[in-house]
Amino acid sequence: MDYFCTDMTKIFTIGFSGKSSDTFLDVLNAARISCVWDIRLWRTSTYVPYYNGNNLAMILGNRYEYHTEFAPAPDILADYKDKKISWAEYEKLYRELLQKRDPLQNCNISKLDRICLLCTEKSALQCHRRLAAEYIAEQIPDIEIIHL
């Protein structure tokens, strides 16, 4: 399916690991984020309850959405965490999963500008949020990705 946006659309990514709740909100506000898309497989945090999906939904209100269509498959994530597959293999499997799911089919493309893909990892380098952002940019022309 072909998707189109007008002008240059910016999408952001953020990982909450190592960020206080105040810092997290300050970063989102400074970037003028329109909506946080939580793309974690499980939207709970044992270590930092502030980042549980229900808490984020209360704090962010209509600026929070849970998008399971961008979450990794449980088996792929488990195999990577258990070191059964390398990052390169994880990346390949996750990209194939996105192609199969076509996660943009149920998203309001006109509201993509200034969304922020949320996950746990501090760095986007080895996190599926980077891959999800790249997937969106491959599907839609004129997308700029910014990692917060």
PLM segments and residue spans:
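Residues lining hydrophobic/aromatic ligand-binding pockets adjacent to catalytic sites
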Residues: D2-L148
